[in-house]
C-alpha cells in the first residue's frame, strides 16, 4: 500500500486561489473583503446587510451517530459534500465552525476536515486563524475584570460575592483551572472569592457571537448577560456594569464571517466555534444566513452526534432564526458502529458483522430522532480502508430496513469524485420539498419539562432528575420571565445517556441534571448533566507532544 499523506501534507500541497477570486465567484467585490493575508478574509457588514434582500438557497445539515473519541469525519463529510455539490453543477457553500486550541493540542485534533476534503489554510484555521477566539476570550474576561473591579471600588450594585456566576475563560484544556480562589494576596488585590475557568468555546460570549444577527443585536445580547445576583436574588446584568459597549468593540470584527476555500477551490465560511457537548454546537447565524443568500445549497454541520448537535441546531439555532433545513445527512462509520456494538477500540480493524449489526441500533435511533423534527434524512457511510464489503452491505441493509438510504462515500481519499452519488441524492431529497421542520417542544413549556422532553424523546431515558436547588432555580427564572427559552443540554457525546461507556441505544436510563446556568444574552438555559465539564482536561498523551516545527520551519503533527 502506498504511503498515505497526512492531512497537513495534503493541505500544504494545495493550489490555492487568491481569496478575492473566491469572493468574486460569490459576487463579493474586493472592497467588501477584509483580507487576512492572501487566502482568508472577512466579509464586510455592509455587504451582508445588502445581501439580506436576496432569496435563500437550501440548507443541508450534516450530523452523525455517537462518535468514537477520534471523531467520525463529520466535518470531512460536510466539506466533501460541498465540493460534491459544486462538482455536479450546483452553487454550494460550506459553513463550519472554527477550531479550538483545546482539542487541537488535546485528543480530537483540528476542525478543518481531513484527507482530500479539507478547508484551507488548514494550519491557520486550526490555530489562531483571524483572531476571533482571542476576541471572544478578551471580551469575556473584560467582563470578569469589570465585575471584580466594581466589587473592589465599593460594590455600588450590591453584588453578593457568593453569587457571582460569571467565570473566566481560556481557549485551552486545563483541568487545574476548573475551580480557583481569586483576589488572594491582601487588600490591594480585592475581596477573595471562589471562581473558575471554562474553555472559550463554552463561553456565553461565543454563543452570542454565533446567534447575533448584527452589531446592534450583538450589543443588546451582551448587555443581557447575567453576571451575578444580589442578596435579594435579583440579577445583575453586564449593562449594569457598563460593559456591553466595550465588549462589542472587542467583538466588532469577530462578528464578520471568515471566507476561505476548500482544497478544490470552492467557498467556505468558517465562523464561530461553540462545542456541542457543553454549548450549542453550531457555526454562526451570520455565516449561515449570508451563505444562504449567495448559493443554491449551504452545507453546515452541528457538533458530535444528532442527540447533541442536531437537536440544538433545530431547537436553538433554527428556532431563534427561522432557518428551515431542507434535508439532513447522518454520517456513520463502520468502526463507530462496531464500537457501539461492543468492540474494543484496538480491535476495530477486524471484521465483525455481528457487532456491527448490534451497533446499528445507535444509527437507527439517530434516524428516528431526525424524523421527529420533520426533516428528511440520508445516511453517509464515511469509508475507512479497514471496512469490508460485508460490513458495508450490512449497514446498507440495516438502513434500508428503516426505510432510508445509505450511500458509501470516499471523499477522504478521492475528494468530490468520491461523494458525487451522495450529492445527487441530497439534491433530490432537498428538491422533493419533503421537509416539514418543527422544533421538538413549544416555547411555553416549563423549563424542566423541556429537559424531560429531550431526555425521553431524544435520549430515550425514563426521566431527568434534579435536586431541589436546581428545580427552585428553574422556577425562579420562569418567574423572572425566562421560561420561554430553549434548553441547551451539556452531557457526554459518546452515549445517549450520561455514562460515556454505555454505547448503542440504551433505554430507560435516568439523566441527572447536576447544575443549570442561565445564558440570558444567548437566549437559552444550560442543563449540565452527569459528569460533563465545561473546562476539559488533557488526555494522558496529548496531541501537543507530537506537534513541532521541522528544520524548515514548517508545522508537523497537526491534524
UniProtKB/Swiss-Prot annotation:
Listed GO MF terms: ATP binding; formate-tetrahydrofolate ligase activity
Catalytic activity from the UniProt record: (6S)-5,6,7,8-tetrahydrofolate + formate + ATP = (6R)-10-formyltetrahydrofolate + ADP + phosphate
One GO term of the biological process aspect: tetrahydrofolate interconversion
Protein name listed in UniProt: Formate--tetrahydrofolate ligase
Pfam families: FTHFS
Taxonomy, superkingdom: Bacteria
Keywords: ATP-binding, Ligase, Nucleotide-binding, One-carbon metabolism
Pathway the protein contributes to: One-carbon metabolism; tetrahydrofolate interconversion
Keyword Nucleotide-binding: yes
Amino acid at each position: 500500500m502506498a504511503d498515505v499523506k497526512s492531512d497537513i501534507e495534503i493541505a500544504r500541497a494545495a493550489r490555492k486561489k487568491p481569496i478575492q477570486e473566491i469572493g468574486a465567484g460569490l459576487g463579493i467585490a474586493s472592497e467588501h473583503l477584509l483580507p487576512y493575508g492572501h487566502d482568508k478574509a472577512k466579509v464586510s457588514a455592509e455587504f451582508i446587510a445588502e445581501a439580506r434582500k436576496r432569496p435563500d438557497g437550501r440548507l443541508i445539515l450534516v450530523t452523525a451517530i455517537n462518535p468514537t473519541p477520534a471523531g467520525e469525519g463529520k466535518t470531512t463529510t460536510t466539506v466533501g459534500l460541498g465540493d460534491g455539490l459544486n462538482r455536479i453543477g450546483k452553487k454550494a457553500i460550506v459553513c463550519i465552525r472554527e477550531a479550538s486550541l483545546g482539542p487541537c493540542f488535546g485528543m480530537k485534533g483540528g476542525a478543518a476536515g481531513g484527507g482530500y476534503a479539507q478547508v484551507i489554510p488548514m494550519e491557520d484555521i486550526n490555530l489562531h486563524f483571524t483572531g476571533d477566539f482571542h476576541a471572544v476570550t478578551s471580551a469575556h474576561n473584560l467582563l470578569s475584570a469589570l465585575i471584580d473591579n466594581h466589587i473592589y471600588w465599593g460594590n455600588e450594585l450590591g453584588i453578593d460575592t457568593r453569587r457571582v456566576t460569571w467565570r473566566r475563560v481560556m481557549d485551552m484544556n486545563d483541568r487545574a483551572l476548573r475551580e480557583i480562589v481569586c483576589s488572594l494576596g491582601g487588600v490591594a488585590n480585592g475581596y477573595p472569592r471562589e471562581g473558575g475557568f471554562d474553555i472559550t468555546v463554552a463561553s456565553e460570549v461565543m454563543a452570542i457571537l454565533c446567534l447575533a444577527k448584527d452589531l446592534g443585536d450583538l450589543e443588546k445580547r451582551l448587555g443581557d448577560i447575567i453576571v451575578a445576583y444580589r442578596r435579594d436574588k435579583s440579577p445583575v446584568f453586564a449593562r449594569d456594569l457598563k460593559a456591553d459597549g466595550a465588549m462589542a468593540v472587542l467583538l466588532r470584527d469577530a462578528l464578520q464571517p471568515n471566507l476561505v476555500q476548500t482544497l478544490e477551490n470552492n467557498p467556505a465560511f468558517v465562523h464561530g466555534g461553540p462545542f456541542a457537548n457543553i454549548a450549542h454546537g453550531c457555526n454562526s447565524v451570520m455565516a449561515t444566513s449570508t451563505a444562504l443568500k449567495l448559493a443554491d445549497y449551504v452545507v453546515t454541520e452541528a457538533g458530535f452526534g444528532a442527540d447533541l448537535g442536531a437537536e440544538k441546531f433545530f431547537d436553538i439555532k433554527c428556532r431563534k432564526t427561522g432557518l428551515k433545513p431542507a434535508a439532513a445527512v447522518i454520517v456513520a462509520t463502520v468502526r463507530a458502529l462496531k464500537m457501539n456494538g461492543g468492540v474494543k477500540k484496538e480491535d476495530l480493524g477486524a471484521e465483525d458483522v455481528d457487532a456491527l449489526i448490534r451497533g446499528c441500533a445507535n444509527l437507527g435511533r439517530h434516524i428516528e430522532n431526525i424524523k421527529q423534527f420533520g426533516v428528511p434524512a440520508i445516511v453517509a457511510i464515511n469509508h475507512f480502508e479497514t471496512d469490508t464489503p460485508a460490513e458495508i452491505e450490512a449497514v446498507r441493509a440495516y438502513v434500508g430496513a428503516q426505510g432510508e438510504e445509505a450511500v458509501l462515500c470516499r471523499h477522504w481519499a478521492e475528494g468530490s469524485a468520491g461523494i458525487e452519488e451522495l450529492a445527487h441524492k441530497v439534491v433530490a431529497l432537498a428538491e422533493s420539498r419533503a421537509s416539514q421542520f418543527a422544533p421538538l417542544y413549544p416555547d411555553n413549556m416549563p423549563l424542566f419539562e423541556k429537559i424531560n422532553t429531550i431526555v425521553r424523546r431524544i435520549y430515550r431515558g425514563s426521566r431527568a432528575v434534579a435536586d431541589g436547588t436546581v428545580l427552585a432555580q428553574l422556577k425562579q427564572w420562569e418567574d423572572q420571565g425566562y421560561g420561554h427559552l430553549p434548553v441547551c443540554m451539556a452531557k457526554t457525546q459518546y452515549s445517549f445517556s450520561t455514562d460515556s461507556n454505555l454505547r448503542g441505544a440504551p433505554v430507560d436510563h435516568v439523566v441527572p441534571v447536576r447544575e443549570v446556568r442561565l445564558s440570558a444574552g444567548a437566549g437559552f438555559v444550560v442543563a449540565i448533566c452527569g459528569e460533563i465539564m465545561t473546562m476539559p482536561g488533557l488526555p494522558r498523551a496529548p496531541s501537543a507532544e507530537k506537534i513541532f516545527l521541522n528544520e524548515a520551519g514548517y508545522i508537523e503533527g497537526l491534524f
